[in-house]
Amino acid sequence: MTASELVAGDLAGGRAPGALPLDTTWHRPGWTIGELEAAKAGRTISVVLPALNEEATIESVIDSISPLVDGLVDELIVLDSGSTDDTEIRAIASGARVVSREQALPEVPVRPGKGEALWRSLAATSGDIVVFIDSDLINPHPLFVPWLVGPLLTGEGIQLVKSFYRRPLQVSDVTSGVCATGGGRVTELVARPLLAALRPELGCVLQPLSGEYAASRELLTSLPFAPGYGVEIGLLIDTFDRLGLDAIAQVNLGVRAHRNRPLDELGAMSRQVIATLLSRCGIPDSGVGLTQFLPGGPDDSDYTRHTWPVSLVDRPPMKVMRPR
């Protein structure tokens, strides 16, 4: 069925595509740790923290998860993407196992980007369920991981659990008592509008680019991984195309604060998200990187040209590299 046919069917049914929330949406998760541990039923859980120069936040992220290790969580690793600061030292001091990209899959030459790190983490972990948590979070809630694995442990047919949350633009807004927003600019200005145009059924996914999510190993190892910041949108669309909306859940994590990036970096991120989304929808991408002109000089009379590369090359499903 084409996207146009799906849209027509939704309109005939009296609702706009993506207008209704997923049936598998948890707004206020109520599972206890004990209930989730019992629901594991022999399954194992790995938590992966992809990191690149996150010395300022890596310790607090690990500290929010480490009390769960040897209980709900069976494995916690930091997948380091070539940090040049003290990320590795601080992660080890906090009790995490640190694995480099090269160590995770030594027989395969390394490529840059987040998608590469997440893909390689599948070779460095063994859990039946894999949870990804970004390492730049500021004071993350200690129940992020339990909330994300809850639908996988207690639901039927769920393979991917995305997070959603309020995203303040300024870190100071988190404790101000004001219901501030403004974060997630790439999500709101690029990803969700494009999904509305090309995959309207996914309009009910509040945070398609969220870096906090969980999935079954069976699913993750069967999918290609898009490069760089295209990895999240690629996994979401691939899961939907393969298994449908019923396989995707989302959980409210409350508030998420992290280091917000400048607009030039967000432009590069957006370019990769667009390239991946177009490719997943069968639309050819030019493969041309994003050229920006950055003002400088005392009177902004000088502009520096900078081109960010974009990649159209996925990594193959890990099952191809490491059959089990």
From Swiss-Prot:
EC number per UniProt: 2.4.1.266
Gene3D superfamilies according to UniProt: Spore Coat Polysaccharide Biosynthesis Protein SpsA, Chain A (3.90.550.10)
Cofactor: Mg(2+); Ca(2+); Mn(2+); Fe(2+)
Domain of life of the organism encoding this protein: Bacteria
Residues holding UDP-alpha-D-glucose: 50-54, 81, 114, 134-135, 229-232, 256-261
Catalysed reactions listed for this entry: an NDP-alpha-D-glucose + (2R)-3-phosphoglycerate = (2R)-2-O-(alpha-D-glucopyranosyl)-3-phospho-glycerate + a ribonucleoside 5'-diphosphate + H(+); (2R)-3-phosphoglycerate + UDP-alpha-D-glucose = (2R)-2-O-(alpha-D-glucopyranosyl)-3-phospho-glycerate + UDP + H(+)
EC category name: transferase
Subunit comment: Homodimer.
Purpose of the protein: Involved in the biosynthesis of 6-O-methylglucose lipopolysaccarides (MGLPs). Catalyzes the transfer of the glucose moiety from UDP-alpha-D-glucose (UDP-Glc) to the position 2 of 3-phospho-D-glycerate (3-PGA) to form glucosyl-3-phosphoglycerate (GPG).
Similarity comment: family membership: Belongs to the glycosyltransferase 2 family.
Protein name: Glucosyl-3-phosphoglycerate synthase
Organism, as annotated: Mycobacterium tuberculosis (strain ATCC 25618 / H37Rv)
